[in-house]
């Protein structure tokens, strides 16, 4: 291939595709960060604005990350907590109202702790673009004693 020919994504190796700079959405960046941090189990319940996190993680090699849709957000959190109890780094993704569904295991887990890393990626929906309500997850996390990393410019 000469220098003038374009490289289609299909022509690149997986390593080349991951190391070349290209813009990412916020959800893709969360997935990439999880993969780079060694997350091996990812579970989620689909709901905008968080759906693309698991969809992006599912594009990585299945031997590297087990990405699965769950029946609901509580089940997604249970899967991630179970993996973290076994020393595996895990992630559960959901939208803000899904955190309400997962409240029981989340509130209990924060006092039990984990053996592997555990990340809950919860996407709020300010302005109610695709949800039935607007809530501030930071307040929920404060109640549950969960540290919060908040994206900014």
Give the label of every model feature segment:
Residues 13, 17, 25, 40, ...:
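A near-ubiquitous, low-amplitude feature marking generic local secondary-structure context
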